[in-house]
């Protein structure tokens, strides 16, 4: 199984969260190969200075090239909240799963409609760095639920 976490975020490892991301990638290896793809270019930076709508269009343009294969799931605070068991079902019986984390202005509705699903981790606002860690932990938890591993009790 292959899981991609595709995020609109400036590239580069931060000192605080990067070790946690690497930890979850490592412990997920018996179940799936997990990759994190960070996208942020001059076009996105410029668009964010113009307007929220321009920013969303630039995010869609950057993210759409990853929509071609697998199951595509956007993290969207306005979408259905899921618990860990519902999240695990999203991973079950899939060969490739792509998770999308939008930029500061979220997703265009058109991009969300191209995804197979959109889910929310709740109504709180999390930084991009932190939501990446939460997603990585939930991916590992979901994989362990699906494999009857004792991590989730």
UniProtKB/Swiss-Prot annotation:
It is an enzyme of class 2 (transferase). SUPFAM superfamilies: alpha/beta knot (SSF75217). InterPro entries: Alpha/beta_knot_MTases (IPR029028), RlmH-like (IPR003742), tRNA_m1G_MTases_N (IPR029026). S-adenosyl-L-methionine binds at residues 63, 102, 121-126. Its EC number is 2.1.1.177. It comes from the Bacteria. Keywords: Cytoplasm, Methyltransferase, rRNA processing, S-adenosyl-L-methionine, Transferase. CDD domains: RlmH-like. Belongs to the RNA methyltransferase RlmH family. Homodimer. Specifically methylates the pseudouridine at position 1915 (m3Psi1915) in 23S rRNA. This is Ribosomal RNA large subunit methyltransferase H. It comes from Sulfurovum sp. (strain NBC37-1). The gene is rlmH.
């Amino acid at each position: 199984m292959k899981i991609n976490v595709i995020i609109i975020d400036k590239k580069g490892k931060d000192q605080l969260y990067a070790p946690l991301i690497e930890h979850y990638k490592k412990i997920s290896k018996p179940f799936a190969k997990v990759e994190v793809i960070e996208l942020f270019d001059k076009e996105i930076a410029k668009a964010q200075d113009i307007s929220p709508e321009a920013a969303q269009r630039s995010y869609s343009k950057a993210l759409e090239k990853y929509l071609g294969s697998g199951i595509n799931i956007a993290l969207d605070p306005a979408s259905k909240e899921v618990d860990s068991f519902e999240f695990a079902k999203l991973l079950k019986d899939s060969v490739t799963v792509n998770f999308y984390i939008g930029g500061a202005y979220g997703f265009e509705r058109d991009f969300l409609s191209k995804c197979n699903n959109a889910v929310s981790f709740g109504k709180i606002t999390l930084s991009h760095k932190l939501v990446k860690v939460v997603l990585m932990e939930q991916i590992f938890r979901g994989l362990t639920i699906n494999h009857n591993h004792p991590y989730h009790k």
